[in-house]
Amino acid sequence: MLRKIKVTFIINDEEERTVEAPIGLSILEIAHSNDLDLEGACEGSLACATCHVMLEEEFYNKLKKPTEAEEDMLDLAFGLTDTSRLGCQIILTEELDGIKVRLPSATRNIKL
């Protein structure tokens, strides 16, 4: 049986939705499998910033540093914060049990 952890999505700064999610999947995959509005226009290929999310500092600090490619995409994200990451690049581990993921109120999809 796959080990699962709790992931709480914060929507529009008010609604919270907690789901159980299998370790090894990305935040983007979990959002999509739970019908949450996190776009992911490039389907996780690190070619857009539409899966931009904000994390609490505690969980942000548990992640590996963003790659240069992720940082380049984050520069295009709407409402960038110090704890912003791309949902497609956050892979769930046991250490992230209880993570809270804030969904932005808007995204910026730049078509190339």
Curated annotation (Swiss-Prot):
The keyword Metal-binding applies. Pfam families: Fer2. GO terms for biological process: P450-containing electron transport chain. One of its GO terms (molecular function) is metal ion binding. Its cofactor is [2Fe-2S] cluster. Keywords: 2Fe-2S, Electron transport, Iron, Iron-sulfur, Metal-binding, Transport. Residues 5-107 form the 2Fe-2S ferredoxin-type domain. Binds 1 [2Fe-2S] cluster. InterPro entries: 2Fe-2S_ferredoxin-like_sf, 2Fe-2S_ferredoxin-type, Adrenodoxin-like, Adrenodoxin_Fe-S_BS, Beta-grasp_dom_sf. SUPFAM superfamilies: 2Fe-2S ferredoxin-like. [2Fe-2S] cluster binds at residues 42, 48, 51, 88. The keyword Oxidoreductase does not apply. CDD domains: fer2 (cd00207). PANTHER family: 2FE-2S FERREDOXIN-TYPE DOMAIN-CONTAINING PROTEIN, FERREDOXIN/ADRENODOXIN. Ferredoxin are iron-sulfur proteins that transfer electrons in a wide variety of metabolic reactions. Belongs to the adrenodoxin/putidaredoxin family. This is 2Fe-2S ferredoxin. It comes from Rickettsia prowazekii (strain Madrid E).
